[in-house]
């Protein structure tokens, strides 16, 4: 068996949005007009599925594969969401120290609403210290991993959420 290690998984057909996807929904609905000045390496779930199938069919036994896309800033993701919706949804970057202030309130909100926290200390730490260059070259070479452009992922994702009524 081969082992795959995806980066931050995003994309359409997410019927119960997790942390990154809920952030996209919130941006689209105007709930997050300012975003932190950081990002993540995002991988489209459809590309991850293709890589997983290829790992079963072509992967080397015991080999680990990093399945990543490209690093993108949340500000850019907000621009893409705005393009898809035909309106501006993100207006600028938050100073880094301010990102810590809502943590206790986010925790309480999650307890009351029984919904996952969109912002966690771990998410802040990962975004601040995470490697912006994630090497997926082995997966590209041995599994034929070829992630689609983030623009396609975001447009398809927002369209999916619109159809589900999560994005107005």
Cite the ranges covered by each PLM segment:
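Short aromatic/basic micro-patch
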Residues: 3, 39-42, 71, 133
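Internal helix-turn-beta structural module
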Residues: 131-135, 144, 149
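Low-complexity, charge- and small-residue-enriched intrinsically disordered regions
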Residues: 33-41, 105-131
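Conserved beta-loop-beta element that borders a ligand/cofactor-binding pocket
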Residues: 1-12
């Amino acid at each position: 068996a081969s082992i795959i290690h995806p980066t931050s998984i995003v994309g359409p057909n997410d019927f119960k949005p997790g942390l990154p996807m809920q952030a996209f929904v919130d941006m689209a609905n105007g709930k997050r007009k300012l975003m932190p000045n950081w990002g993540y390496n995002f991988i489209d779930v459809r590309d991850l599925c293709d890589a997983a199938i290829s790992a079963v069919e072509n992967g080397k036994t015991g080999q680990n594969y990093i399945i990543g896309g490209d690093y993108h800033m949340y500000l850019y993701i907000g621009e893409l969401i705005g393009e898809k919706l035909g309106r501006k949804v993100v207006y600028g970057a938050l100073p880094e120290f301010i990102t810590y202030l809502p943590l206790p309130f986010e925790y309480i909100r999650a307890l009351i609403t029984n919904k996952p926290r969109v912002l966690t200390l771990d998410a802040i730490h990962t975004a601040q210290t995470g490697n912006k260059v994630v090497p997926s070259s082995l997966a590209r070479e041995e599994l034929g991993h070829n992630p689609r452009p983030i623009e396609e992922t975001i447009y398809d994702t927002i369209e999916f959420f619109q159809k589900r009524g999560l994005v107005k």
